[in-house]
């Protein structure tokens, strides 16, 4: 009885072996990139390590200032960006839930697209569920980033004064580490948007889905290691 129910549930998704393979590759690429990117460097160079040093330098400079309004403004601007991203993601999720609520009409529209491969309504619904899941994960990452930025604000408020120089090194390190955690969560949320685009390409078929996932990984790697911004930040962090 239990095996029959499991088989029926698997059939309801209506995914072919190629679809399952492309979906598995997508999950490995998405979650694997998020897990490995903060830890991996290419040719001894990593924008994450460079930015850790830049944030530490920023916090050292901040602790030496009597007036920290500019620093508070910069953090506030970043918090606004995170809040906007979380709000936008909620709107996207609401729209996708609306699609699931009228899946028949949405299926008819999607089937009429020239690039869309033939698919059943169950398969189309599975694809909508996957992209909805991606945006739900993105929302949780943005909201966690926002909470960590709020913790950072509390630490900035409790930071030692310019006269307490013996406490600056440790305080700057703690502030920089917490900021890095908040930024990492925010970056993971942004990357979820990149990978959500891959699921849209899935409408054209599993082969295009797998190819789009590979393309997004290449784009992210170039941004992370090969872009002009990455080189400039690395040069700044490694200068004497």
Task: State the predicted function of each range.
Residues 1-16:
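Short, strongly hydrophobic alpha-helical membrane anchors
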Residues 10-12, 90-117, 202-210, 216-221:
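Juxtamembrane "helix exit" motif at the C-terminal ends of alpha-helical transmembrane segments
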Residues 13-24, 115-131, 206-211:
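Hydrophobic alpha-helical transmembrane segments
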Residues 19-47, 83-97, 128-150, 194:
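Hydrophobic alpha-helical membrane-embedded segments
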Residues 37-78:
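Membrane-interface amphipathic/juxtamembrane segments adjacent to transmembrane helices
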Residues 71-97, 124, 128, 181-210:
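Transmembrane alpha-helical segments and their cytosolic interface motifs
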Residues 76, 151-158, 177-184:
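Short amphipathic alpha-helical coupling elements at transmembrane boundaries
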Residues 157-176, 180, 223-240:
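Cytosolic/matrix-facing juxtamembrane and C-terminal tails of multi-pass cellular membrane proteins
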């Amino acid at each position: 009885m239990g095996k029959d129910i499991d088989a029926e549930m698997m059939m309801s998704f209506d995914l072919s072996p190629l679809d399952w393979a492309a979906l598995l590759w997508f999950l490995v690429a998405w979650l694997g990139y998020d897990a490995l990117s903060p830890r991996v460097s290419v040719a001894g160079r990593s924008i994450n390590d460079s930015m850790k040093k830049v944030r530490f330098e920023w916090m050292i400079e901040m602790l030496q200032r009597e007036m920290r309004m500019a620093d508070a403004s910069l953090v506030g601007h970043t918090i606004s960006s995170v809040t906007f991203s979380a709000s936008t993601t909620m709107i996207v999720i609401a729209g996708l839930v609306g699609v699931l609520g009228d899946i028949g009409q949405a299926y008819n529209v999607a089937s009429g697209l020239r690039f869309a491969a033939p698919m059943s309504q169950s398969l189309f619904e599975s694809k909508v569920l996957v992209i909805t899941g991606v945006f739900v994960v993105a929302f949780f990452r943005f909201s966690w980033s926002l909470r960590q930025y709020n913790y950072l604000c509390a630490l900035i408020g409790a930071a030692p004064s310019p006269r307490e120089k013996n406490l600056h090194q440790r305080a700057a390190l703690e502030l920089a580490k917490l900021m890095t955690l908040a930024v990492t969560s925010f970056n993971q949320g942004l990357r979820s948007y990149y990978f959500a685009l891959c699921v849209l390409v899935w409408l054209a078929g599993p082969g295009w889905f797998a190819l789009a996932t590979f393309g997004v990984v290449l784009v992210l790697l170039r941004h992370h290691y090969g872009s002009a911004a990455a080189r400039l930040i690395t040069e700044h962090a490694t200068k004497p």
